[in-house]
Amino acid sequence: MRECLIARLTFTEYTQKSTIEIACGDTDAGKELLDTIIDVSRENSIYRGHNLHLSYESGKKDEYGDVEKPERFQITFSTIEDVTDEDIVLTEEHLTVLQRNIIDLYTRRDILEENGVPARRGVLLHGPPGTGKTFACRFLCHKLQGVTCMFVTGSSLLNVGAIFSFARLLQPAVLFLEDVDLIFATREINLYSTALGDLLDQMDGLRARENISVVLTTNAIDRLEAAIKDRPGRISQCIYMGAPAPAQRRLFLAHQLRDHDAAAVDIEQLVRDSDGATQAFLKEW
């Protein structure tokens, strides 16, 4: 590498941001060094391969336009409960679709690349509250060991650009964007049109060789912007998750009772009595 000088590495406490400045007479050499620093930080990041929760707090300016409160993008390690193969209460159809559209993209990446298949997908999980959408996301995290899984929800979805930039830095990665209808509603009722446009641009901007998938969840698919859910290049599979069938209820109830003395419990009667109940209802039953 040609001669370069790292002029300054600073961290600003107020904004919680780091800055690298490089002074060099040769622009290409400076860029080469900067790229090397980014690559090393990417490969050695403490966040790589873990389950993360991303949160964003918007900034605030005073009446004179000065920053009163800086925007903050925070990253914490997620403590979601692991879901193993023994815990699965999804249907075979759901498992097959998740395997084909998400898991195989990471476990069979080399084969897909050899055959020119893009290793990125968008999947939308939709259905009433409490029907297992978050459970399915946790299952994917369990199956994708070594993949960076990032959970984003609520107002944090407003900072789409930073979310996707972080995913690119730590790929292979899966972005779990939860309750997306709250921010990315149809244009007629959307109060966050800028964020909606950013999401569409980011999903369209994923390159074929970028190993990033996006899993969206919503309780109200009718509210969700059509440009997200109806565009194959953005969403490759919409998966409806309704109230569990008898077989899934039986398995779910058995799991809930496995650490208790349930010898006197009639599981089959519980299955019959719980027709139409969601997993969330069964858990509190």
Set out the residue ranges of the language-model regions.
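The conserved phosphate-sensing helix
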Residues: L124, S274-W285
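AAA+ P-loop ATPase mechanoenzymes
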Residues: M1-R109, R120, S155
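Walker A/P-loop NTP-binding motif of AAA+ ATPase domains
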Residues: T84-L270
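Hydrophobic side chains in well-ordered alpha-helices
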Residues: A29-I37, I163, F252, W285
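Loop/helix-junction capping segments adjacent to catalytic residues or to phosphate/diphosphate-binding pockets
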Residues: T27, K31, D222, P246-A247, ...
